[in-house]
Amino acid sequence: FFDSEIRATDEELTFLYDYFFTIDIWGNYELELFSTISTLFPLPLYFKYSREMLQKTDLLGSLPSNKVGIDTILINGLFKAIEEKDKLKADYFTFQIEKRDLPESEAYLKIIYMIAKGYYDTIFNVKNKGLEKIQRGITILQDLEYVDGARYYENYFANQLSNKDL
């Protein structure tokens, strides 16, 4: 997992934009690369790139390997928007995820999305209801022996929620 304090430089962002958006159709490689480095982008840029990514993947977006990459990018965008308390962008990512309908075969992503929805509720709606969803998601990860994932989200929310006036 990445250090959330690291940000890409303007020069790096320009290079990445030129690379990503001169390619007409994104495949698995571009999605994997974008998914890996996109956490370095500030939210406005992540949002812009994600919208453009959805257009670039229209043709190949339904392939199983590409679908997982796209879903991961959208869920990461949702977390990023919630962290910055940008409800409009969080709602956009939620809409795109709901529209794509996470399949049962991607249970891990469904659990992470449930955690993200709990975070959304904690920040924008009903705090206790959201915290319950987060804890339930982490418990499911623990029960399924996704130890690293459960630990990551426990630490993530210990940091995020202790630094906020909820």
Residue ranges, per PLM feature:
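"A position-specific structural signal for the A-helix of alpha-solenoid helical repeats
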Residues: F1-F2, E32-T36, T72-K80, L109-Y120, ...
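Alpha-helical linker/edge segments of TPR/alpha-solenoid repeat scaffolds
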Residues: E5-I6, P42-K48, F79-A81, K117-K129, ...
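Amphipathic alpha-helical segments of tetratricopeptide repeats
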Residues: F15-F21, L54-G61, T94-L102, Q135-Y146
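C-terminal non-catalytic interaction modules
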Residues: N128-L166
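Alpha-solenoid helical repeat architecture
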Residues: W26-L33, P64-I73, P103-Y113, L144-N155
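Helix-turn-helix repeat elements of alpha-solenoid scaffolds
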Residues: E5-T14, L43-Q55, E84-F95, G130-K133
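Extended alpha-helical scaffolding segments
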Residues: N76-E132, L141
